Structures are given as C-alpha cells and as structure tokens.
Amino acid sequence: CAEGGSSIDEWSKESTLFRHAVSEAKFAMENSELIAILWHQGESDGRSKKYKNYYHKLNILVNSFRKELGDLEVPFIVGGLGNYLGKSGFGRSCVEYDLINQELLKYVENNRNCYFVTGEKLYPNPDGIHINAESQRRFGIRYFKAYQTKSSIVEPLDNEANMVKELYEREYTMAEKRYITLEQFTLGKSSMEEVMKFLK
C-alpha cells in the first residue's frame, strides 16, 4: 500500500493507512505467502527534528505489522532516503533525510530480521522527491538483494546497471504481453482485430 507524503504518525496502528495496509496484506495472504514487508517512508519526517522520535515510532509500527499479520519473524526491509533530497522541488524541505537514514540504520542493527537498503545514487523525477523509473528499478534490485541475502545493502550494488539493462531487455511474459496489448487497445492505439489476433 502506498500513501505519498505521509508521515510516520499517519501510520500509527489505529490509523486508516495502517488498517488498510493490514487488510490488503491479509487479503493477498489468502492465496499468497507473506515473505517480507518493504518500508519506504520518511521524507515528511525529514525536517523539524522529527527524526528524534522516528526510531520509537518505527519500532511500534514494525511490531504492530508483524503481530497483525501473524508472523513475528517476517523480514522488515527499510529503504533509505535518497541523497538528492533537501535540494529542489517538493524534496527541498527534507533537509534532515540523513538523520532519518541514521535512525533507520540504528533500528535495523538493533532488531532481528530487519534490513536497510541504501537510497544512495538514486535520482528524482523533476518534482525533487519521487525517484525516477530507472532508480525505482535499482531500488527494487537492492530490496531483493537484501531479502535474498538477509543483510543490509549499505552501498549501491556494483552490477546494478547491468541488472537494470537485463530487466529492460528481457522478453515479456505472456501476461505482460496481454496487458500491453489490451492497454494499447484501450488507449486507441490498436484495433480490435489486433487484439483478437493476439488472443488466439
């Protein structure tokens, strides 16, 4: 579940955001396995010394998610904030991003099955706060590596560029091809005949 611009206070266990995330996760768990919780949040807390209470609030949040989802050992992987913050656009006010990152690192060092993924060398969209498409892919690779190795990723991976290239060059699955075909039709960029030809 995503909620842009939310502070950690908006994710308290009584909040709508928390309850919605738990509800969606439980729905998915009806025919899927929960293997990790990924957390990327903090830009809204990267100012006005809010970092001072971040560790405590994150601890309550992690324990609440694990308890509600019935797995006290599920890996919790936190994404660090990018070093492009504090400079432009909507990210300009997030001048304490590095202090949030320090709290995240401290948290994963002190708690079981918690891992950190660096936001270093990721790049924003023109809005100055959200990471661009290629950076999202790099971040995803880092999250996966943290999950796969059960360890924190504190530096960008050496071979990220090649991994991203492989993602772009790989052949689409049939499900992806079907989605693209239907999307093109919906956007008026292909005909019904082309859709029917593909579906045969």
Regions found by a protein language model. Name each.
Residues 1-200:
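Cell-envelope and extracellular/periplasmic
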